[in-house]
Amino acid sequence: MRITIAGKIGSGKSTVSQEISKITGYSVYSSGTFFRESAKKMGMSIEDFNRYAETHPEADYATDGMQKDFMETHDNIIVEGRLAGWICKIYSISAFKVFLYATRYTRLVRFSNREGIEIDEAAKLLDEREISEKKRYLDLYGIDIDDLSIYDIVVNTEFMKPEEVAVLVLNRIDEMSRKEVYTPRILKGM
C-alpha cells in the first residue's frame, strides 16, 4: 500500500505522516526533501529555488521524476508532498490519497513556529511559496493544486491532534478496503 499525504504549508503533512508511520511501520518519504536537496546543491534557499524553478522547468521535472520512479518501485510507504497524489493519479500509481487542510492563520502559526520566524515574515514567505507553486504546477502539468477531487479523504487538521488524524485516515483506508471486498457479496444476497 502507498499512502500520499498532501496539503498546503503548515497543514500538518509531515507530522501526520510520522504518526501514520508509527502505527503502520511504513517509511515516510518527503518530496520536499528532494526539492530541498536540489536547492542546497545550487546554493539557494527554498524561496530562491522556487523562483528559479519558475523559469527552469527542468528543476521540477527532475524532482518529480525521481518521486514518480520511487513510488512506482516501492510499496508500504508514505509519501508526503504537494504533488504526491497528483503524480499517482497522472501515472496510474495505486495509492490512497490524503489531503490535509487548516485555516491560513493556523498554518501561519505552525509555519512561523517551525521556522522560528515572526508571523509577518512567515506570511510573506508562505504566500510567496504557495503562489509560486500553484503557478508552476499549472504551467508545467496543467494541475490546479487546489482541485481536491482526486483525493480519497480530505481532513481538516485545525482542531485535531496529529494522532487523531492518523487514526481517521487509517480507519478510512480500512473502511474502503472492506467496502470494495464485501459490498458485492452483500448486494448479491439482496
Curated annotation (Swiss-Prot):
Subcellular location field: Cytoplasm
Keywords on record: ATP-binding, Cytoplasm, Kinase, Nucleotide-binding, Transferase
Catalytic activity: CMP + ATP = CDP + ADP; dCMP + ATP = dCDP + ADP
Protein's name in the database: Cytidylate kinase
Keyword Oxidoreductase annotated: no
Chain sites annotated for binding ATP: 7-15
EC number(s) per entry: 2.7.4.25
Endpoints of the signal sequence: none
Designated gene of the protein: cmk
An annotated GO cellular component: cytoplasm
Major subcellular location class: cytoplasm
